Amino acid sequence: MDKKKHDSHQHEKKADASQEKVEVAQPVSDADRIKELEEALAAKGLESAANWDKYLRERADLENYRKRVQKEKEEILKYGKEEIIVEILPALDNLERAIDHANEESAIVEGVRLTLSMLLSALKKFGVTPVDTPPGTPFNPEYHQAMGQVESADQEPNTVVAVFQKGYLLNERLLRPAMVTVAVKA
């Protein structure tokens, strides 16, 4: 009989607990439910606005990336040939020296002149131009490299006296400075 009492007592406890649960889960009033839904809607609206803002930022980043890549491609096309041109310049210098030091006018000298002219013409098509540095030109460290100084009464101080080696530009960007001597006061 004790066992029956004990079982019935446990059964009563379970019944009380289930009634408490039922009491807790009573239906919410319509006004409270509407308020909850409005709050949830407002939260989702904020989340949506944040996601839209994030989307716009990512899209702008992508557009900036595309522009940067396009600019880099243009730079590569414009200056990508720089290495090979720098390697060709010493051969160009040697052709000029050969013409300058030729003792006679011969077919070989004329052939070297023609070769030099063709090479300069081809380089010009790719945007290569010599740095114009006649004697008397003011020394410009952006385009000239001073190899020495010479006292001169004939020339203004800080002007080019002689050019040892021509300088070259590639699309207005310096490839190699002109090697020059510079006048100083006598």
From Swiss-Prot:
Keywords associated with the record: Chaperone, Cytoplasm, Stress response
CDD domains reported in the protein's UniProt record: GrpE
GO biological process annotation, one example: protein folding
Compartments in which it is found: Cytoplasm
SUPFAM superfamilies on file: Coiled-coil domain of nucleotide exchange factor GrpE, Head domain of nucleotide exchange factor GrpE
Region (Disordered) residue spans: 1-29
PROSITE patterns cross-referenced by the UniProt entry: GRPE (PS01071)
Compositional bias (Basic and acidic residues): 1-23
NCBIfam families with a match to the protein in the record: PRK14140.1, PRK14150.1, PRK14158.1
Identification of the protein by name: Protein GrpE
Organism expressing this protein natively: Geobacter sp. (strain M21)
GN (gene name): grpE
